[in-house]
Amino acid sequence: MKLDDSSLQKFGFIKRDTLGSINIDPLQTGGRLTEAAKQALVEWGDGYSVCDFCGGILDQIKKPPIYDFVHKALPEFLDCDEARVTNGARESKFAVMHSIGKPGDWIVLDGLAHYSSYVAAERAGLNIKTVPHSGSPDYYLDPEGYATAIEEVTKESGKPPALALVTYPDGSYGNLPDARKIASVCHEYDVPLLLNGAYAVGRMPVSAKEIGADFIAGSGHKSMAASGPVGVLGVSEEYAPIVFRKSKYNKVKEVELLGCTARGATVMTLIASFPDVVKRVRNWDQEVENARWFSARFEEMGFIQRGQKPHSHDLMFFEAPRFYEISEKVKKGRYFLYKDLKARNIHGIKSGLTKYFKLSTFGLGKEKLGIVADSFEEILKKYEDV
């Protein structure tokens, strides 16, 4: 590509077509910026802006109050002993896997684990044993499956796995497994547990200590109203010296974090939104009520919600047999749903999906959820003769 004036015109400021739409994309509902975060994005957008008064390590910066956020607020919020800011939940998971395990060790993952959990384990050189789920319609994860997996690893390798991970909730069906029971099972075998709370931390109450998780990973851009990439990591006192070990070449830098992580706008939008995030977590019961209301309304229309019932999270998976029938007959094919929703200013169902799809009701409130439900009903009626 020749970098002349003509070719460069495609870059520069780019407008976002979906801005202002009713957004039901699970990836985005929990990451919508607060007004304070939007201001912080501009105020702190210059590269290393937070380093005006840096003494050598990000989490020790007092002005702006990153130190207080990382070492006082986050441990209280996550209910853990020590915390750090990372470049995302996947980076949090990798830091734990890489520090706790050694190449050739084993990790146990749940059958609904996010792809990044697999990739992080692969990058850390770990072998993977998976705990199966029950399949459709519930996709239930039996905590005792962790005992079976741990025993299988021990039999095959001669020692227990270095780590176990549970996804809470999973990103496909929004199921909340019995994480406390899973932690108890893992600890019976002296296997530490990593809770992947990318869709939980910042949306709903989560306590690492109450669950018994040794590590907890959260996503700032997915669930804490922050500009990505940014995440959080909570660690128990027992494992903190291992995960947060210092470099022998630079005494203040932590190896697994490559010294410093989220600098500038990412960490400052996370901090800016934090007061609102703490408050919205207290409203979780209403979010669950809204999700259940929405699911019931959808099922009245013939959609089928898969996963836990009654559902306890905003992320939901639906089968849509009627939409699939329509897609096989109309001119627009499998893209008809995306286009009809776009015409109604609704965004979040991936283009081309009709047979099944997932969505999130988080933060929308009953009024907007009613608009979404009405729109789906209108689309069904539009094609009722097809």
Curated annotation (Swiss-Prot):
Belongs to the SepCysS family. This is O-phospho-L-seryl-tRNA:Cys-tRNA synthase. InterPro entries: PyrdxlP-dep_Trfase, PyrdxlP-dep_Trfase_major, PyrdxlP-dep_Trfase_small, Sep_Cys-tRNA_synth_arc, SepSecS/SepCysS. Its cofactor is pyridoxal 5'-phosphate. The modification N6-(pyridoxal phosphate)lysine is found at K222. Its EC number is 2.5.1.73. It comes from Methanosarcina barkeri (strain Fusaro / DSM 804). Keywords: Protein biosynthesis, Pyridoxal phosphate, Transferase. GO terms for biological process: translation. It is an enzyme of class 2 (transferase). NCBIfam families: PRK09331.1, SepCysS. Pyridoxal 5'-phosphate binds at A89, R90, N196, S219, G220, H221. PANTHER family: CYSTEINE DESULFURASE, O-PHOSPHO-L-SERYL-TRNA:CYS-TRNA SYNTHASE. The lineage of its organism: Archaea, Methanobacteriati, Methanobacteriota, Stenosarchaea group, Methanomicrobia.
